[in-house]
Amino acid sequence: MAPNNVDNPQNCVVNNTINGGVGVDDEETYGYAAQVLNSCVLPMVLNATIELGVLHLVNQAGSGPDGLSPAQLAALIQARNPDASVMLDRMLRVLATYDVVSCTAVPTEDGGFERRYGPAPVTKCFVPDEDGVSLAPMLNLVIDKVFLQSWSKLKEAVMEGGIPFNKVHGMHAFEYPAVDPRFNEIFNKAMYDQSTHIIKNILAKYKGFSQIQQLVDVGGGLGHTLRVITSKYPSIKGINFDLPHVVEHAPQIPGVEHVGGDMFESVPKGDAIFMKWILHDWSDDKCLTLLKNCYKALPENGMVIAVETNITDQPETTAYARAISQLDVSMMTQNPGGKERTRREFESLAKSAGFARVDFVCCASSFWVMEFHK
């Protein structure tokens, strides 16, 4: 009798072909294709476990057999659905296949086993840290219906031009929050959490703020980045510069002045100008206009401190390269001309705006700190 392959899904080859003619040699390829076509499942499941509080519980659990069973998790979140434990088990199994959580099979008295879930290294990225921030709000933003709807217009944008987000919503992504308070709150929370996390890592490595007296944060949102910077460097006078509808909601921060305006018209003067994830939002023409305004606002020997990703010239298969390539297409879909840039592209932009040189100083949380020197 032929061996039973049912219990091992990897042994699913029948008569040298599967699923309409994919050959044995293509088994791994087909499996990868199946993963790609269902890749939207991962962020949706992850977001649901975050909203349910399940990921937080898993992060607090022990590892291996000390992890939490689906039944325990269902009880802890007080789910009324009798099928909740089965649903959670299936959801967490997906996360375990991506190493978002860990999973251990523990034998049961009836000769079977139950899966118990605990934290993996990346789990902590999606639960609040000591500052109460995580990547969870950014995930919530990425899968929000406002952004998801834009993808339906990507093909049309390729064929006919235009920005997918604008085609759906009738305005660009930085105008939209002013007319949608719900989305504005989601956007601001995502920016706050990611900014707080990354700026702390930057301050641990980057020492370029030590001699600055007046620092302008262009596109600084509600001023949280300047709050963190000025907490470490209290001698700095901070100017938080953003659109009027943004700064009107900004809280009072000691040593920080909130200024509303249009960065494509002018930029407040300072010893240095800080821009985090601003250049990647805009086209080369818009960035050139902005950088020229920055150049005018700086004294001799002043500099722009820009925090951005550096995309590689050739595609790579590392997690970093995939993340940056995905972000690049997200910028293309959601933002007015947004893109991730190579080092050469940043150097070209800076020099076209009049800056003498670009220094790539350090990398923190996958983002490069660059100095554009006047």
UniProtKB/Swiss-Prot annotation:
<dbReference type="Pfam" id="PF08100">
    <property type="entry name" value="Dimerisation"/>
</dbReference>
<dbReference type="InterPro" id="IPR012967">
    <property type="entry name" value="Plant_O-MeTrfase_dimerisation"/>
</dbReference>
<dbReference type="Pfam" id="PF00891">
    <property type="entry name" value="Methyltransf_2"/>
</dbReference>
<protein>
    <recommendedName>
        <fullName>O-methyltransferase 16</fullName>
        <ecNumber>2.1.1.-</ecNumber>
    </recommendedName>
</protein>
<comment type="function">
    <text>O-methyltransferase participating in the biosynthesis of natural products derived from phenylethylamine, including mescaline, a natural hallucinogen potentially used in psychotherapeutic treatments. Catalyzes the O-methylation of dopamine to produce 4-methoxytyramine.</text>
</comment>
<comment type="pathway">
    <text>Alkaloid biosynthesis.</text>
</comment>
<feature type="binding site">
    <location>
        <position position="219"/>
    </location>
    <ligand>
        <name>S-adenosyl-L-homocysteine</name>
    </ligand>
</feature>
<comment type="similarity">
    <text>Belongs to the class I-like SAM-binding methyltransferase superfamily. Cation-independent O-methyltransferase family.</text>
</comment>
<dbReference type="InterPro" id="IPR036388">
    <property type="entry name" value="WH-like_DNA-bd_sf"/>
</dbReference>
<dbReference type="InterPro" id="IPR029063">
    <property type="entry name" value="SAM-dependent_MTases_sf"/>
</dbReference>
<dbReference type="InterPro" id="IPR036390">
    <property type="entry name" value="WH_DNA-bd_sf"/>
</dbReference>
<feature type="binding site">
    <location>
        <position position="242"/>
    </location>
    <ligand>
        <name>S-adenosyl-L-homocysteine</name>
    </ligand>
</feature>
<comment type="subunit">
    <text>Homodimer.</text>
</comment>
<dbReference type="GO" id="GO:0008171">
    <property type="term" value="F:O-methyltransferase activity"/>
</dbReference>
<dbReference type="InterPro" id="IPR001077">
    <property type="entry name" value="O_MeTrfase_dom"/>
</dbReference>
<dbReference type="InterPro" id="IPR016461">
    <property type="entry name" value="COMT-like"/>
</dbReference>
<feature type="binding site">
    <location>
        <position position="242"/>
    </location>
    <ligand>
        <name>S-adenosyl-L-methionine</name>
    </ligand>
</feature>
<dbReference type="GO" id="GO:0032259">
    <property type="term" value="P:methylation"/>
</dbReference>
<comment type="pathway">
    <text>Aromatic compound metabolism.</text>
</comment>
<keyword id="KW-0808">Transferase</keyword>
<feature type="binding site">
    <location>
        <position position="262"/>
    </location>
    <ligand>
        <name>S-adenosyl-L-homocysteine</name>
    </ligand>
</feature>
<feature type="binding site">
    <location>
        <position position="195"/>
    </location>
    <ligand>
        <name>S-adenosyl-L-homocysteine</name>
    </ligand>
</feature>
<feature type="active site" description="Proton acceptor">
    <location>
        <position position="280"/>
    </location>
</feature>
<feature type="binding site">
    <location>
        <position position="276"/>
    </location>
    <ligand>
        <name>S-adenosyl-L-homocysteine</name>
    </ligand>
</feature>
<keyword id="KW-0949">S-adenosyl-L-methionine</keyword>
<keyword id="KW-0489">Methyltransferase</keyword>
<keyword id="KW-0017">Alkaloid metabolism</keyword>
<dbReference type="GO" id="GO:0046983">
    <property type="term" value="F:protein dimerization activity"/>
</dbReference>
